[in-house]
Amino acid sequence: DGSIQMNLQELQTIIHHKMGIKIFIINNGGYHSIRQTQKNFFGEPLVGVGYDSGDLSFPDMEKLSAAYGYPYVRAEHNGQLAEAVEKTLAMEGPVICEIIVSTDQNFEPKSSAKRLPDGTLVSPPLEDMAPFLPDEEMDENMIIPRIKG
């Protein structure tokens, strides 16, 4: 839900060209990747992540969908998910489906920094995603030599 704010102009492009695109927004109450990073490396208090940090808010997606002319579907819990997805996929034209998830849900695999024994943080290559595999297992699965730094 936070990251879709960075590409709102694309909603108009989809409507303008009458594309049959179904947009599924995973609403985790803000910028969840930033939230996870702050919790994993620094703990509380959170800053700049969403409602739980108290310094950011986001628009109502149902109202935003209507402003762009999209039909809107919402699933607030697991029991509503299958019906919401089926309804969204069955509709003609573009549709926005908002799926509410917990702010505590972890997303994996994901690109993540590694903390070295000396405390410094490094960004590994994109193929080395969290949860991190042992070096031996990564080496076995690579078809090209790994870049180690």
Segments and roles (model prediction):
Residues G2-G149:
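Thiamine diphosphate
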